[in-house]
Amino acid sequence: METSAPRAGSQVVATTERHSAACRADPLRVSSRDKLTEMAASTQGNFDGNFESLDLAEFAKKQPWWRKLFGQESGPSAEKYSVATQLFIGGVTGWCTGFIFQNVGKLAATAVGGGFFLLQLANHTGYIKVDWQRVEKDMKKAKEQLKIRKSNQMPTEVRSKAEEVVSFVKKNVLVTGGFFGGFLLGMAS
């Protein structure tokens, strides 16, 4: 006696076909889930013995590390990790950034200061002659150009980047707070 119940997996194929059709509209966004659904759909009615089983453990091992960490669609980290994990990740990355920033800043300040010192020494000993009238003339010209370009509106590129940063901070408040706290600790150490 035959029943009219759908075959096992037919509902999954129907929902995944809708998802893969939506994702196929964007050619840059091709995920491994889409590949799996296409493979499943193409072999759905073909059980003549020519099919290959898929070992999900092996498939997961072949995925890049960033896919495992961020998932298919990396959204706000607040949805993925606990509060403590977010603060820890933000704090550690902030501390590392602050520590590196402090050490590189010292090196850069030493290099710039040493360069100015050598230029002053060369000027004092007569190796370099500075035409101060020409410097003053160029400074006046630069001031005039700045006055001409001065406006109260930000360029659209700057505005769009600022909006992106604000959106990121709003979505990831804990990670951002941990980062800034860690950055300050890294600068102090």
UniProtKB/Swiss-Prot annotation:
PANTHER family: FUN14 DOMAIN CONTAINING, FUN14 DOMAIN-CONTAINING PROTEIN 2. Its main location: mitochondrion. The gene is FUNDC2. It is found in: Mitochondrion outer membrane; Nucleus. Belongs to the FUN14 family. Residues 102-107, 186-189 are mitochondrial intermembrane. The modification Phosphoserine is found at residues 10, 53, 151. One of its GO terms (biological process) is intracellular triglyceride homeostasis. The keyword Cytoplasm does not apply. The lineage of its organism: Eukaryota, Metazoa, Chordata, Craniata, Vertebrata. GO terms for cellular component: mitochondrial outer membrane; nucleus. This is FUN14 domain-containing protein 2. It is a multi-pass membrane protein. The chain crosses the membrane at residues 81-101, 108-128, 165-185. Pfam families: FUN14.
